[in-house]
A protein has these predicted regions:
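Nucleic-acid substrate recognition interfaces
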Residues: 1-174
Length: 174
C-alpha cells in the first residue's frame, strides 16, 4: 500500500532556479520524445523506443538537472500512451505547455538520495531544503520518491511517496 504526504517547502533562490530548469527540462524531454514518436510512427508505422539519455549528448544542459526526473518524464509518456491504447476516450498524449501555471517533476529515491530529517529535505542536485513538516511519518514506511511542484501563486510543495508494509493476515484454525 502506498501513502503520500504533501508538505510545503521553502527553497532558496538557487534552488528555485534549479527547480525552474528541471521543470523546463522535463517538459522539453517529454515534448521531444512525443514529437519523435509521432513522426516515426507516421513514417514507418512502428513505435520508436527512445530514452532521455539520447538527448544529453545533443543538449548538454540536460546534464544540469536530476536524471531520474528526466526518466520519469519518459515513464509519464509511456503511461499516457498505455492509457490511450487501453481506452481511446482518454485521448492521444498532448504536448506540455509552458503556460500551465502548475509545474512539477518526479524523482525516485535511490540509495538514500532523498532524505527527510530535522525539518529539512534533501533532494538530488538541490541539496537541503527547509520544509514545513506538519505531521510525523511512521518509521516503518519506506520512502520511494518525491514530486516537487510549483503552484500558480509561486509556492512550492513536495509530495513524498512512501510504501507501507501490508499487515500480514493471521490464519486461524477452528
Amino acid at each position: 500500500m502506498n501513502i503520500v504526504y504533501r508538505f510545503r517547502i521553502y527553497p532558496n533562490k538557487s534552488q528555485k532556479e534549479l527547480f525552474a530548469r528541471t521543470f523546463g527540462c522535463v517538459r522539453f524531454v517529454y515534448n521531444r520524445m512525443l514529437a519523435e514518436k509521432k513522426e516515426y510512427y507516421e513514417k514507418t508505422g512502428k513505435v520508436l523506443k527512445v530514452t532521455p539519455a539520447k538527448y544529453k549528448a545533443e543538449f548538454p544542459w540536460l546534464k544540469e538537472v536530476d536524471s531520474l526526473a528526466l526518466c520519469n518524464a519518459q515513464l509519464h509518456l509511456q503511461t499516457a500512451y498505455k492509457n490511450f491504447f487501453r481506452d481511446s476516450s482518454v485521448g492521444f498524449p498532448k504536448f506540455k505547455s509552458k503556460k500551465n501555471p502548475v509545474r512539477s517533476y518526479t524523482t525516485n529515491c535511490v540509495n538514500g538520495n532523498i532524505t527527510l530529517q530535522n525539518a529539512k529535505l534533501k533532494l538530488p542536485k538541490a541539496g537541503w531544503i527547509r520544509i514545513k513538516q506538519h505531521r510525523s511519518i511512521d518509521d516503518r514506511y519506506i520512502l520511494k520518491g518525491a514530486t516537487v511542484s510549483q503552484e500558480a501563486d509561486d509556492k512550492y510543495y513536495v509530495s513524498l511517496l512512501y510504501a507501507a508494509e501490508e499487515a500480514e493476515h493471521e490464519i486461524r484454525s477452528v
